[in-house]
Amino acid sequence: MNPMTLEVTIKSADVFKKINRFGKMQLYTTATLHGSNRGSPAECRTKADGLGGSRPLWDTLASFRVDESEIDTDRLVLVCEVKCKKCLVPNTSVGTVNIPVKELFQQSHQRQSFFPEEEDVAFVISSEMGKPRGVLYLSYLFRINGLVDFSPFHAPSAPPLCPSQEDGE
């Protein structure tokens, strides 16, 4: 069917409990699209935020190619995992967010705007045991491939008439 691009901006998070015992937490997120027919899942990773502590700011754009037929089968899931970067030991998982792409697509179609706009959403970060660990803030946008987005362009005005053309000379 229609090839589209799912653009996800991973904005920030708010983690409830400190993971590191010593020093500031350096949190980062990996976003992976599972369920696609293209073989291995597409993945994007944010940089570790060493300044934000339990409230990191990333503002990282991740783009995933999806087909409308894949969305309709309800197999596509965007998995965002928030991790804590550590120096001496392996990185620790804070928690994950599993987002069905079909729900995002249905929400974006309910707005029915001619020019698509990003939609801000928040999801609960859950531990492996299902306990809430924080909130992940992101925005998303579906773009149809092959169509030009004319929203940043402006129509040019007509050039001014020269005085010699007005007189008919």
Short names for language-model regions:
Residues 3-55:
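Calcium-regulated, polybasic anionic-phospholipid
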